[in-house]
Amino acid sequence: FRIICRYKSGCWPCCHGATVSGVFVTMRIGSFGAVTELFRITGRIEMLVGVPKEIKTQEFRVGLVPSSVAELVHRGHQVLVETNAGTGIGASDDEYRAAGADIAATAGDVFAKADMIVKVKEPQPNEWVQLSPSQILFTYLHLAADAPQAYGLAKSGCTAIAYETITDDQGGLPLLAPMSEVAGRLAVVEGASHLKANAGGRGVLISGVPGTAPADVLVIGGGVVGVNAAKMAVGLGARVTVFDRSVPRLRYL
């Protein structure tokens, strides 16, 4: 499975010209971004952007917050949000209405009407079958480890744009880095919890207390996840060691 994507700042969502052939997807970037792709597919420039409620287990986020909806509406687009899509982040249907969105009763209504579907996590099997060749899907996909999803999306014919493959002019991953920051920090919180004796751990308090040494934390890898894990552990008072094969990276740290 091959995805090629290059992010241009100021271009939202960003990609156009995606082609699907079997399970091979190639994405090319252009100055008009997804609006150009929509024009190629439908002959229109204005989008109807759909935001379904996330249905993956333990996923509480939402594809667009009300302020993002307001920005899209200001730029001439329409937004259709499934009812209660923002409940997990404390955003009510009324807030979305105030931002200019219409509220759909079901996810089926969103998939049936939207030009672009904006999500957080990868679509589930009952969502693949609702996608069509005339639609753009913009979300995290993580296709390398999910062949069934790759085949499902290819079969739908939709233009699927993965957040995690978008790169900036410096080769960075601006839409993946925030998730890595969260993962690194939460890793230390979870690890500290499992050090407690009642969780089967050694009864070590990561910060230590007067008379008791803090925990020794080893972080393997000095990338975005590792750096944020190290920052969190240092902030909690642990003694931290980072292993990495890159000497320049270790010097930076």
Predicted regions and their residues:
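Generic secondary-structure signature for well-ordered alpha-helical cores
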Residues: H74-Q78, A101-D102, M116-K119, K155-T159, ...
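Glycine/serine-rich phosphate-binding loop and adjoining beta1-alpha1 elements at the start
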Residues: L48, E54, P125-D216
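An N-terminal-biased, well-structured beta-alpha scaffold segment characteristic
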Residues: I45-G152, S156
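Glycine-rich phosphate/diphosphate-binding loop of Rossmann-like nucleotide-binding domains
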Residues: P52-T87, G201-L253
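Short, Lys/Arg-enriched N-terminal segments with co-localized hydrophobic residues
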Residues: V23, S31-E46
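Cysteine-centered motifs
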Residues: C5, C11-C15
